[in-house]
Structure formats: structure tokens, C-alpha cells
Amino acid sequence: MVLTYRNAFGLKKSKCIDWLKLNVSLAKRFFGKHGRWAIAIDPSYISKAGKKTPHIGRFWSGCAQSVKHGLEIMGIGLIDIDTKDCMMLRAHQSLNNKELSLRNKTMVDFYISVIKRYRKELLKLSTLIVADAYFSTSTFVNGIKKEGFSLISRFRDNACLFYVYTGPRTGKRGRPKTKDGKIDMKNLDLTRMEKMEMKDIEGTAYTLIAYSKALKCKVRLVIWQMPNGKKKLFFSTDTSLSGEEVLLYYRTRFQIEFCFRDAKGYTGLMDCQARDKWKLDFAFNASFTSLNVAKVTMKEMGMEYSMSSFKSLMTNIYLVRRIFKACGYIPNRTLISKIFKDLSCLQRIAA
């Protein structure tokens, strides 16, 4: 049976499309076979009314900056720090607070379980997970560490961090000394850190290996001092990364936000009115896959990325083909080719 959107809509997991495998192949077609990749994760609020939809509840909406009634999906994407782009891999619907309480789990525990579910395929792409400051907790770091992943994220501005002791051992009994004084963000010891040379950032950035009290481990720390005097703290639990790589990975993470924006605006991420979890799962992932196909097509056609222009182009091509099909005569191919190009490019605008 040939799968179409209609006959695949609502199929159970065992019979449905392997979205992760499909999107990985599209990502490799877009980025190439290899690159400096990381797994970006981000929960996103989906507006939904009613009471009977599976997992409906109250979730945080970043756009509204408040908790709202609806659904939430955990978006998993692949980012490339060289092309500074993102391809979506999978969407997984989140449980609501009542369902989590019955399972004696927190939302962070649930996010870890989602990564565990797809770990086999994700580890083939990267061992790095990039997420916002919400995920910079010991529970999440230890949870993904067991699955073979390291975290790149951002600390709160008041995070408790220490310089790492690098001196000789005393030879005394007991645990070796690991910390060598708290890092005072208002009075940095520049002799213990390295200044980063990055042309595309404003302000000054420094990097060092530090000890995090909250995470209870050593991290590669990047201290970004902005022109207004404020400091932002980025880190990686993989200390082999350079400070430049940590900052590049975290800044590229924001590309997943643009994927959510374009999927909501152009490929119907929020349009499904189904009340079945398999149909919702299909709709969410079909939306992201449609976005991936559009990105690959635009790249291979040599088009600048613009979902608005691409959607207009595809609509025009569809209408032109319908007109030609309905004409019922043998066309002049040279003339029709010229007319086809003229008509299909109508209403193309920049995003």
C-alpha cells in the first residue's frame, strides 16, 4: 500500500512512518554526511481547546510568558554550527501535570525519557545536547549522561561556580582538593582564564574549566561580558570542547525556534483538530517533515530560504498544472515552458 497523508493519518506506531529515520535522511541531504552537529531540544506550547484531547493540560507558553491551557510538544532538532541552521528530527507530545503525578515523575524526568526513547538514532548523529537554562539542573545532566550525552546550556546569572584546583596533591588522607575559591563575577581573576577571540560577538568573552556546585561536576565555562556590563554564563559538561565551540553551539540553538515559527506559520503545526494521540503525533511530525522537505528543495533549487515565497511558488505550480491538465490538447512545449515559469513565479515575496 502506498502511504498518503490521508491513509497514514492515525496509524498506530508500528505501522506509521518512522519520522526520525526519514528526517535524519533529509538532514544529511541538507547538511551533508558529516558536520559539527548537536541535538537541540526545546518544548513548545500548542494551542488547543476542550477537555478530551490526550495529554491536554496547562503548559508554559514562551510567547505569552504565562501558563496556558493546551498541549506541549518536545521538539528535537539537529543543528550545524558551520551552516548555522537546524533540521527538525522528531516531535513528541508531553504529558500533563496530572499524568506526571500519577507516574511520580517531574517534567524534567519526562524530557529525559524522551531522549532515552530516541537515544540509539541520536547518538549516531551527536553526543551533544543543546538546551536552554531550564535544563541546567543536576537531574537532567545526570539523566542524559547515563544515556551517553553531554549538555551545552546556560547557567543562571547567580550560579555558584568555583575555580578548579590545579596544584600538587598534599599527600594527606582524604578526598583530593578540587575547588580553589569561588568565582566572583564582579571581580574576575583573569590570570585563571583565557580570553576568547571571536569577531562576531559584542563585548568580551573568557573561558576556563570550572566546578559547578549545582551540577556537582567540572564544566567548560564561558563568561560573556556584554557592552552593558551584564554577564552571561554558558557551559558544556564535555570539557574537551573549546570555549568558542560552546558559544557557537548555544547560539545556533536558537535556529530551532525559527523551525517552530515556520512550522506554525506555514506547515500547519497548530492546525490539527484531532482528539487521538496517534493522529496528533502524525500531524505534528508531518508538519516538521514538510518544513524539512521545503528547506531541502529550496537549497537544491538554488533559492534563498523563504517559506512565504516557497509556499506561493508551490501553490502557483499546482494551479498551473491543473489548468494545463484541464485544457485537453497537445501543447506547444516551448511556449508552455515559458508561460509555466512566468505563472509559477507570481506573488513570490521575501519572508
Predicted features, each with a name:
Residues 83-91, 104-108, 112-116, 164-223, ...:
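A short, flexible helix-boundary coil/loop motif
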